[in-house]
Amino acid sequence: VNIIHRPEMVPEYAEKVTGQGKVEDIGRKALLTESLDIFKFQQETAHKNGLKTTIQMTYASLFNDEAVSLAKEHHEKYGDEIALSLLGLPCEEFRKKYKTKDFCIWMFSMEDKKNIVDDVFGKFHDRFGFYPESTGSYYMDAELTNYIKEKYPMVKCAVATCWEEGPKAYHTCNNSWYTLFDGGPWNPWIPSKQNTHAPAANEAEDSGI
């Protein structure tokens, strides 16, 4: 069993659920404390039951010393994998740098995707001293997957889809779960270089992830 989760320092639901009636402040201390408490509880529960985890660090969590310290400690003590997620982009640092509130990696231009990937992977390396062997997002299109494998060949696997993010993800209005079967395969697969959701038919189509 592999438990995969992430320290989501700026949960996407936060401003809708816990921030109602308040001025937007994605950096407020209460939000960060709540997010870290959730992460700690998940880690504690897994380890108490003898399970290892894959900690998918988000861009936002890479700026949080406590989240980074916990990941390092649990990597050494329990053998947890430290991975990298392309979720968790909408933090203050990201908004200031890219001048946008958008956070869906698949909706950016290819040039912006490359810049964001290099930024996130570079920040990860700065904090941990190595590059991750796995990554992920709600949806990773073929161009993005191909670029990551070419630029960061140590990446072996990716959570490249979410059960509700499929072809309709590009509408960016998938706010209900009626698209239950719109996502990618529900089991491991080798994605095609042409289409992430299409399994590679042969070695030539193999994306390498």
Model-derived segments and spans:
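Metal-dependent polysaccharide deacetylase catalytic core of the NodB/CE4 family, i.e.
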Residues: M57-Y139, T196-I209
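Glycine-rich loops and low-complexity Gly/Arg-rich segments
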Residues: G27, Y78-A83, F108, V159-W163, ...
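Short catalytic/ligand-binding loop motif for oxyanion handling, primarily in non-cytosolic enzymes
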Residues: V10-E12, L62-E66, P90-F94, D141-N146, ...
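Short glycine/serine/threonine/alanine-rich loop segments
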Residues: L51, F130, M154
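Active-site-adjacent pocket scaffolds in enzyme catalytic domains
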Residues: E133-I209
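Extracellular structured ligand-interaction cores
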Residues: N2, K52, G79-E81, P132, ...
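Active-site beta->alpha N-cap acidic-glycine motif
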Residues: V1-Y78
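Amphipathic alpha-helical segments that form well-ordered structural scaffolds
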Residues: I38-T45, I116-K123, R127, Y147, ...
